[in-house]
Amino acid sequence: MKKEFLFACALGLSLTVQAKGHLDITSYRYAGPYLVSRPLLVDSTDVNAKAWSAASLLKTPLSLDAVGQAPVSDADKLPSAPAEGYALHLMQFDLENTAYGKAKFNVSEVKDWQLYVDGKLTDKQEMALEPGTHEVVLKYLSAPGESVKPKVSVDSDGEFSLHQGQSRLYTLADAMHGTKCAGVQVSPDGKYLIVTYLTSLKEGRSETVYCVKETLTGKEVARRSEAIRWMPLSGDYYFVRQGVSGRQLVSVSPATGFERVIAEGLPEGNFSISPAEDYLLYTLVQEGPKERQEIYEVIDPDDRQPGWRNRTYVAKYDLKSGLMQPLTFGYRNAWVSDISADGREALLMVSTHRMGKRPTTLFSVYRMDMQTLEVDTLVEEDGFISHALFAPDARQVLIQGSPEALGGVGMNVEKGQTPSMIDSQLFLMNVADRKVTPLTRTFNPSVRSVQWNLSDGQIYFTAENRDCYSLYRLDPSSGKITLLDVPEEMVLAFSLADKAPVMAFYGESAANSHRIYTMNLKKQKAELREDLSEKLLKGIRLGRCEDWNFVSSRGDTIYGRYYLPPYFDESKKYPMIVYYYGGCSPTSRNFDTLYPFHAYAAQGYVVYVVQPSGATGFGQRFSARHVNTFGDYVADDIIEGTKKFVNAHPYVNGKKIGCLGASYGGFMTQYLQTKTDIFAAAISHAGISDHTSYWGEGYWGYSYSEVSGANSYPWANPELFVDHSPLYNADKIHTPLLFLHGSVDTNVPVGESIQMYTALKLLGRETALVVVDGQNHHIRDYSRRILWQNTIFAWFAKWLQDDASWWNAMYPPKTL
């Protein structure tokens, strides 16, 4: 008996066996036979009045895992069915594809069978598969002594391949699933690590676990679902749990597992433990005045943001007495920035909100004596600082801020330039005389996270180093900064032992996911402790990722990189996707990202990622180009880079280039189309079309304009706000342009896409608008992210691969 199933597959990559039209599947992986027996018939029918039949044995649950590990063999070498008893058999083969198509699967020479595609049983006559390597398993039943050798063939109007290799294509599913590192903490003595693992599962479920491991051996000594951290003195780890009398603070010895309840009835809120473990410093929230829901007054532009009226304050909880002593009071936000190594002092920060002058938020830093509560003001209302740390002896304070902080002592820009408020610098203040020394004024990377190590007195920090997150050591006595040699391009987080020369960190690179390391700070050599990437990418073939830089017509070196398809053939022509942000930050070399570049490359694209003017990580003068330019410099760099890349790489089809950007990058997508016609398709996600409406309506519109449009306002600088807005240049756009937007985007409101889409429709231009319901600036919902990403894939397939089938399947043409 013959059964036929029609599958809509993505078909196109040539591997071992390739065909258009008809393909006989002549080789498989086989597992079996698995004997199954007729059950005891206690009745002649079941609860649905159906009699037992041998065909029901096909529904016997059977794991598909074994067949995936079996060797490949020819179809005519399948083993015969057992002479006695019924048996189940598994046959598996892989179909690989990079483009959307349709295929018809023909199964014959077997009566009872089931088909699984990518691990899921299908009984549909028609189904759609996305581009990738698809595991197809035929599960069939044989009767006693029956000679069964199924035949499978595929008919298609597209091109596809029978994949017989050990590697497969990287897909969106790979980007969305698996176990990643979400944090690493080294114990004070350096002997143990706390590693936080986040596992993303199918259907949007996730699981977080905290593991305590021996640093040298990797042996796991504890695993918990509660968040855990290290006690600073004892070296135990601690967590908070609900007890009979309220919240309990519990410490556990990693060596023995012995638990000790430190405090009962612990107040709610976030806290830090003092170095001597004698008190907790809380940052608590006081709720602000409420308004009626049906009608309400907005007292400040930021009052539209949920929780803006709430204020934080600081309190000290004495672990011996249980006394909670408020340390700050007022209507301004206050929080703990650091505690001195001896626990005698704390650095508190207070923010002041003002309208009428840039910057609209000011920060003060106070040094408070924890015994007397006496306060010393270190910094008073500076709008350009963000963080402060004590030196080990508390005689100096390390301050993090932008170049304009502390009177502009760290500025290093050209005359007429305003520094980027996103470009993060380090400053050293002597507490005794308040003398400030800029530590990174001529240091091009932009500081991210920083710690002052108690063990060796050195300052360690990560920084945006072009498109990498590099790890550095700074000697506070000499000011010398040293780049530490680590195996990863992106150091995502690090932790220092207080009493030993040990660092732990984790990172990733453009071609691998997370790996966890430790480093002996005396030897300065990183040692791999766990390779999560190896598990995530097992059996996956990635295309190459290479650096490609060019010298612009202005004389600047503009950095970039590109990704090639996994089965790249230099003799062929490939469409290309150009990706950029174009705003205040570079597009870093993360492997795990909302825009998985390897997944684009796996669909047959060359992907060029460019770092145009205005990004941090290249020096203050470079990042200052983001200020009061609204697309100038950036557009020139992207256009020039794209043209030069095509000229330098003959395998790129210069007539099939697409571009993609989000947020400020979405604005750049729109703005670019008013400047050039080199793109065959463009996509703007959550892009700004009118700087004035974004400035006034977005939650952070006016405050972000303090960065990008310093001291410029719509009424005072219409040339910047109007002439640089794509909406007022819509008639210049002729590129097919897709707008994507979350329906509840509070950062860049959805109206930014709607009004630009409306303009292009009125102009009769090729455009589309897709709104993702219930999503904000980023598309985080599991199922919606898949649809959103597939929309991007389908739009590019339509215009860059001349294949509209995927787009039409998702968004069928309508006659309205």
Please identify what each model-predicted range represents.
Residues E130, V184-Y192, I228-Y238, F271-Y279, ...:
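Blade-terminus and WD-like Trp-Asp/Gly-His loop motifs, strongest in beta-propeller folds
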Residues H177-G178, Y197-V209, V240-V250, A263-G269, ...:
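A flexible loop/linker signature enriched in serine peptidases of the S9 family
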